């Protein structure tokens, strides 16, 4: 009996030793394999998954990238699945001006009062700010052509007053003059005195290159910081004559830069038969597309009132943001519509351009 018990014990020890040797060999064999030949580890159950090879099961397609917060910086290098086109899914910001029947801002509306649609499809509002505190980048563009020059002194005075009134420490403004050419008289600055001096130095010129001014002004704003509001305030007679760019180039530049355009049309001739109304209509179309406003002062003294209204509107805007559908063709326009409860008047940009991801 004793001998029999000893043999069983010995057998158990030999079995354990054999299992140990087999496990060691398997481990060595796995470590000697190249990475692509090893079996994957079990998939993690955490919510913050990544698209690394070790977390993707064999014979399965990798998960679709989610780039709402732009986390995947290498998404440009990933091939697009056949038949699909990825576009930017960065947050779409929409500035909204809400006005009552007397064109006065309507403040303090809750998020529940707003609905936003892209291509007719309702979107979830991810960002909502009442009276947004986003700093301003403003391109103040003044027509220096001879056709508008009899009003230039009033324009300069009103613009100088506006600069002193609108600028806060975190805001920046640049002064441009345009005739047949476009000149930046002062770079983006918060220095009120320097900017006012630049306005007073605007020279006489000939020709009116409105489209060129919009292209260059939008480009200058687009190169600024992303988290700032971009505004063009253009004072002109509306008589487009000498631009190298055309209407669509100007419109596309303003939309791509997410520029808010306010147009002040100083009409030297009141009768439509003596004016370039085609230029006025083109400016009005671009202004409406960006969500801005157009003004037709009857007298030079009205300029102060208009500048005050623009200032008040900029300080009472709502900011809405949503994440769009990431699928679709690139470099195309997508429509935006904002609805507000009650009978308020609403202005906002009507479209944006998709970009490659």
Predicted regions: what they are:
Residues 27-357:
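Scaffold/interface architecture of coatomer-like assemblies
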Residues 12-22:
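Bacterial N-terminal signal peptides
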Residues 2-14:
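Bacterial N-terminal signal peptides that target proteins for export
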Residues 5, 21-25:
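Extracytoplasmic/periplasmic terminal helices and flexible tails
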């Amino acid at each position: 009996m004793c001998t029999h018990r000893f043999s069983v014990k010995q057998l158990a020890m030999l079995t354990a030793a054999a299992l140990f040797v087999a496990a060691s060999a398997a481990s060595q064999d796995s470590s000697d394999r190249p990475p692509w030949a090893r079996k994957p580890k079990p998939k993690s159950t955490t919510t913050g998954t990544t698209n690394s090879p070790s977390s993707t099961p064999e014979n399965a397609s990798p998960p679709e990238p989610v780039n709402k917060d732009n986390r995947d910086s290498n998404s440009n290098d990933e091939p697009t699945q056949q038949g699909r086109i990825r576009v930017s899914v960065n947050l779409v910001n929409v500035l909204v001006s809400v006005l009552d029947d007397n064109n006065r801002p309507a403040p303090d509306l809750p998020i529940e009062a707003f609905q936003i649609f892209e291509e007719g499809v309702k979107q979830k509002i991810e960002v909502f700010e009442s009276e947004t505190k986003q700093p301003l980048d403003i391109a103040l563009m003044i027509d220096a052509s001879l056709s508008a020059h009899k009003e230039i002194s009033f324009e300069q005075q009103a613009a100088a007053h506006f600069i002193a009134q609108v600028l806060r420490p975190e805001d920046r403004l640049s002064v441009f003059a345009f005739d047949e050419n476009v000149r930046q008289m002062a770079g983006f600055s918060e220095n009120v005195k320097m900017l006012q001096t630049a306005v007073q130095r605007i020279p006489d010129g000939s020709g009116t290159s409105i489209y060129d001014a919009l292209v260059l002004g939008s480009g200058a704003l687009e190169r600024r910081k992303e988290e700032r509001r971009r505004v063009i305030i253009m004072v002109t007679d509306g008589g487009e004559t000498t631009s190298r760019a055309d209407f669509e180039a100007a419109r596309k530049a303003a939309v791509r830069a997410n520029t808010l355009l306010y147009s002040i049309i100083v009409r030297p001739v009141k009768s439509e038969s003596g004016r370039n109304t085609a230029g006025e209509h083109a400016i009005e179309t671009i202004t409406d597309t960006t969500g801005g406003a157009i003004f037709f002062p009857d007298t030079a003294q009205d300029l102060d009132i208009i500048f005050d209204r623009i200032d008040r509107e900029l300080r009472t805007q709502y900011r809405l943001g949503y994440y769009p559908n990431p699928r679709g063709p690139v470099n195309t326009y997508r429509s935006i519509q904002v609805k507000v409860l009650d009978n308020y008047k609403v202005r906002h940009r009507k479209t944006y351009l998709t970009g490659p991801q």
